[in-house]
């Protein structure tokens, strides 16, 4: 159960990052003032996702050792890289993909799955 909650923290955190990027993209398409930026639905959704992720993270820290939980957050790097490619069509280098592979192997080792 805790591993599933940890995965949810990763998804909320990465979702929040993707929403922040989308907020910036929307501001570039249609310039607006600071007040309008703060009221952006994308920005509000990102704050909600990141806030929920933080609350769930605090809950998990009561149940899991930090030495096990924190390294598992490296999955965030993988998810953000894949999300940036899928949603924002960013170019990802060969070295980045090799790094993703290393991160996945490391997370599996830390989680005792390899």
Swiss-Prot record:
Q: Where are the transmembrane segments?
A: 41-61, 64-84, 94-114
- Species of provenance: Aeromonas hydrophila subsp. hydrophila (strain ATCC 7966 / DSM 30187 / BCRC 13018 / CCUG 14551 / JCM 1027 / KCTC 2358 / NCIMB 9240 / NCTC 8049)
- Identify the InterPro entries for this entry: EamA_dom (IPR000620), Flippase_ArnE (IPR022883), Small_drug/metabolite_transptr (IPR000390)
**According to its UniProt entry, what is the function of this protein?**
Translocates 4-amino-4-deoxy-L-arabinose-phosphoundecaprenol (alpha-L-Ara4N-phosphoundecaprenol) from the cytoplasmic to the periplasmic side of the inner membrane.
Assembly, in brief, is:
Heterodimer of ArnE and ArnF.
* Family affiliation: Belongs to the ArnE family.
Pathway(s): Bacterial outer membrane biogenesis; lipopolysaccharide biosynthesis
Topological relation to the membrane, as annotated: Multi-pass membrane protein
Q: Which Pfam families match?
A: EamA (PF00892)
Can you say where in the cell this protein is located?
Cell inner membrane
Which N-terminal stretch is annotated as signal sequence? none
Q: What is this protein called?
A: Probable 4-amino-4-deoxy-L-arabinose-phosphoundecaprenol flippase subunit ArnE
Q: Keywords in UniProt for this one?
A: Cell inner membrane, Cell membrane, Lipid A biosynthesis, Lipid biosynthesis, Lipid metabolism, Lipopolysaccharide biosynthesis, Membrane, Transmembrane, Transmembrane helix, Transport
Domain named EamA: which ranges? 43-112
Predominant place of localization = membrane
The protein's GO terms of the molecular function aspect are:
carbohydrate derivative transmembrane transporter activity
Q: What does UniProt give as GO cellular component?
A: plasma membrane
């Amino acid at each position: 159960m805790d591993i599933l909650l940890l995965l949810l923290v990763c998804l909320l955190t990465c979702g929040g990052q993707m929403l922040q990027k989308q907020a910036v993209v929307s501001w570039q398409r249609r310039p607006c003032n600071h007040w309008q930026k703060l009221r952006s639905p994308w920005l509000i959704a990102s704050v909600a996702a990141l806030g929920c992720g933080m609350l769930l993270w605090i809950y998990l820290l009561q149940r899991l050792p930090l030495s096990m939980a924190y390294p598992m957050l490296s999955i965030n790097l993988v998810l953000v890289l894949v999300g940036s490619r899928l949603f924002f069509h960013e170019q990802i280098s060969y070295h980045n993909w090799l790094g993703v592979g290393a991160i996945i192997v490391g997370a599996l080792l830390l989680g005792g799955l390899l």
